[in-house]
Amino acid sequence: MSSQSPAEGLQFPIHASIKKQSTSLTGQEILSEALSIVDNKTAQQILAEKNWRKNYPIYFKALVKHGITNSNNPITIAKQGLHKAHHLFDYYRDGKHYLLKDALHIPTSTPLNTVKFKGESEAAPEWYVPYKGQKLSGQSLLDQIQKWENAGIIEPSHAKALREAAAHPEWFDLSDRTMVLFGAASEAGPLPWLARWKANIVAIDLPNPRVWGKILNTIQQGNATLIAPSIEKIDSSAKASALRDKLGANLLTQIPEIAQWLVQFPQKLDLAAIAYLDGEKHVRVSMAMDSIMQYVSEHKPDTSLMFMCTPTDVYAVPKEVAEAAQEKFKSRSQLQKMAVKGVSTLSLKRFFQAPYQDLITSENGKTYGIADCLVVEQGPNYALAKRIQQWRATLARHQGQRVSINIG
């Protein structure tokens, strides 16, 4: 990626050595800084890496490995990585250049206005699990949970959480929660569920009639309340058809406006980082969300954070999970082994490798495996965007905030 004259908003930095933007160099600098204290040798290797787009998984796995060995390492890694990122990315406003870390303090000439829109449904909040065309709830859900657990499809802790949710339908009345959705219209986001659970939904997404038509339609059919930003003052009686052209805020260009708008809310806020963009924009929008989350958390310490991580990443898992996966791998039928061997050979041994090949003992006395599910073809930008979110989650939890991570 290169650019002669950076556009407005959050941008990758221009590197002095090549006099242009480089997503690879930026990623290498951030990961190197993240590892610099816990493993300086690998940190230097990252900076010297000549084939970053192919070899980046090695270094993302190193982050996890060092995070396992010592309970202080994940905090150190997260602090170092985020600090570097906030001092590296640029922000442009009216032709002036700022470091991202300073963007939140830019005076806003056009503050955002608040628009509310209530859903028309009177239905009570309801939760079920969609499965094979059915909506499982009650005893049918409990029976299916038991089948999944018996078959090893879900872990016991997962089964326990589902049973608890089924036993407490009152949990799904969210009329006392104010939930901020960055990238509210995201296909993988929780908007359709929250719209049925009486939540107060602060929706942030691009000013785009198609996007807001979708959001407004979802809210209108549910029992929730939409709270949306607008640069215009809008009459409270405005209908959905009129609102769709007037709502929205851009996470990449309106960072200070969004952050300063959110801290004005008197309610506790639950911030959900679910915005997704393709390629290098995904890193930028992750950094934008991180900047806003950090700012809001500093001004409202009772704020909670939520992230949607990806299964195609690297994670530490308990020893029991790793050993169960190893046992299943060993107990495959002969036909399965032959088929897998063929695919593995054709893919130059990139697919269907034995899981959790190494178990690592931490200084806390526990043993962990590493679930290495990175897909090289997704690229280092995607991996970095997701790592930024994990770092913020790790650091926020360490600092006493409530944090939720879902992988899916």
Summary of predicted features, one role per range:
Residues 156-175:
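A short, basic/flexible loop-to-alpha-helix module at the beginning of a structural domain
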Residues 243-245, 249-317:
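Extended alpha-helical scaffolding regions
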Residues 176-191, 195, 202-205:
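Glycine-rich adenosine-cofactor-binding loop
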Residues 1-66:
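Non-catalytic protein-protein interaction scaffold segments in large eukaryotic complex-forming proteins
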Residues 198-203, 220-225, 264, 290-307, ...:
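Structural alpha-beta junctions
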Residues 306-408:
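Long, contiguous domain-sized segments
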Residues 2-4, 212-265:
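Extended charged low-complexity segments that act as oligomerization/scaffolding linkers
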Residues 44-157:
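Low-complexity, highly charged intrinsically disordered N-terminal segments
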